[in-house]
Amino acid sequence: MAVIGSRNATQYTDKALRSLFPSFKKVNMTIVSGLAKGADYKAHRYALSMDMPSIAVLGFGHLYHYPKETQGIRNQLEVEGLVISEYLPNQTPQKYYFPERNRLISGLSKGILITESKSVSGTRITTHCALEQNREVYVLPGSMFNELTKGNLLSAQEGAKIVLRPSDIINDFL
């Protein structure tokens, strides 16, 4: 399951992942995400803390790291999980690499879970990649008054499945 969302993820993402991940672990789900701060970081941190498999997809070569806030979790993933990149080892981060790597995040997964998303964001790009790849798209419910969940609502309007409990995702994969 790919977990995607805002780089400015709030406690809403924390609470949702804490609620969902124990059930994901019971069915041996692997977590896939980028290595950005926010939702990506939180997804990897929770997965590793629960001894769940976790895969990070870089938007640059292995000899670099960005952002510095996620260096510690990357170090842990290199030992306890998997860190991959389609770029040459010495390739520096470039702005356009991050949307490119989003197709790998969704492509490695049977589905994606959107935690918090603005109406225009990298999360929306990953969502469109997932739809093109015939992946399931799941979304946490959001508020029309919260900028960080307007993208969630747009995804729901486009057919994403709203997640209220772990079984809303797990039942699709059993």
Region spans (language model):
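Glycine-biased, small-residue-rich flexible motifs in mid-sequence functional cores and linkers
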Residues: 1-174
